[in-house]
Amino acid sequence: LWADTRKEGHYGLQYKSTPYRVGPSSGNGVGVTLTMVEMFYSKNGLPIDLDPEYDYTGRYRYGEYHNDVCDGVTMNLNIDREPRFYAWVAFQNGYYEVLRRDGADDNANIVQTRFRKNDVFGIKERTTNYTPTGYLNKKGCSPLYNNIQEDVAAPHYPWPVIRMAELYLNLAEAYANLGRIDEAAAALKPVRERAGLDPVDEAFEKAGLTLGRDEMIRMAR
């Protein structure tokens, strides 16, 4: 609904978020916090501490992560999450979509991310250009960033200041505070559909959970 059209500077979000030395300009420093990582839903569209199918107590243990382009050992916290998690967060043995070579092979433009101390994107002996959390931000970073050419500016696009989704979420929270749960769920539906999630009332019903006022307020926030 409202966007900031000013161009991003060289040391902006895209530079600071992309993996270290994948291309000519990448800072490797904007680390998603653990609190934010845990706020993303499970693959069933529920908070991970509410989903009976999600191993919440074992989330800090290790497991095998597999997808079409890369795999490896990672924390269980990074497995069986919702689509937005994988679109917005890079994690140990996950992937980052950046343009790093010529050619039509989509997999050639995907970097497997490894953040342990001596891994390719780990801290090693550096004092800067590393993620302090073991995660990197992908949200707001164009897959066309980090071309192999030198001195390529970050792809320019209008930065969303006020999103339509924010209005839906505000409306859902207002309905929830009034105890109008059905209307709150209806307001959330377009946001969840766009994110590839079932409607909130269906997700709770499938899990055998009760969707009350407090739960709906939490989902809207």
Can you name each region flagged by the protein language model?
Residues 1-28, 44-221:
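Acidic/polar-rich alpha-helix caps and helix-coil junctions
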Residues 31-37, 91:
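Helix N-cap / beta->alpha transition motif
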